[in-house]
Structure formats: C-alpha cells, structure tokens
Design a protein with these regions (language model features):
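Basic nucleic-acid-binding interfaces
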Residues: 1-124
Length: 124
C-alpha cells in the first residue's frame, strides 16, 4: 500500500470493514447481491479521497477494504455507505419491505480493524 499525501501530512490508513443486514437475514443473493457489488465502489462519487480497494458480498454480510483519510471518521464513512446503499436497495427492490418493515435495512453496528504491518515488520 502506498503512502498518501494530504494538505498537512502523509498517511497509510487501510481498514477492513464488515457489516450485516438487520437480524442477519440472508438477503444478499441473486440480483440483490449483484446490485450491491455494483454499488459499493460508488462511494468515491461522494468522497473522492476514500478508496474502496476490495469488497466481497456474502449471503449475510459484506466485507470491504477501504482507504480512508484521517480527516474522516471510519464510522461516518461506513454510516453514509450503509444509508446510501439501503436507500437504493429499498427503491429498487420493494419486496424488501416484507422483510424489513421500517427504513432500516442494516444492523446498527459494524466491525472495523486496521490492515497493515504486523508486529514483526515493525520491530525490524
């Protein structure tokens, strides 16, 4: 991974992020899965300096590797991604209303961890 430059510093922040549908429902299959896979890289339209490097859509969760500049909180970026994707899915697939009766499609939390150097590399 390369070092990126911002106005007043340099950074190398890479995050592994996982989130799940509410109630861990197995909705991410078929056409919905394909639609989600197409939409995940679109975050760069809203935040050009956030990079989606890798993603994997499983039947009941989503994995992503993101490069997020230090000026953004990981939680705000993930929250916006979940909100935008939820809105698009509910508009395109009205049958989701049978499974999710409110405006909420995703579980409220998410998992994130940093990706990068391990302890052995740092000691060297």
């Amino acid at each position: 991974m390369e070092v990126r430059l911002s106005a007043h510093g340099a950074y190398q922040h890479q995050y592994h992020v996982v989130w799940i549908p509410k109630y861990r429902r197995r909705i991410l299959r078929g056409a919905i899965k394909l639609f989600v896979q197409e939409q995940l890289p679109q975050i760069q339209q809203y935040h050009p300096d956030v990079e989606v490097q890798q993603w994997s859509v499983q039947i009941d969760h989503i994995h992503m590797v993101l490069v997020i500049p230090p000026k953004y909180a990981v939680s705000s970026i993930v929250g916006k991604m979940k909100a935008n994707l939820s809105r698009q899915l509910r508009l395109r697939y009205p049958e989701l209303k049978r499974t999710y009766w409110g405006a909420v499609l995703w579980s409220p939390g998410f998992f994130s961890s940093t990706v990068g150097l391990n302890e052995a590399v740092i000691r060297r």
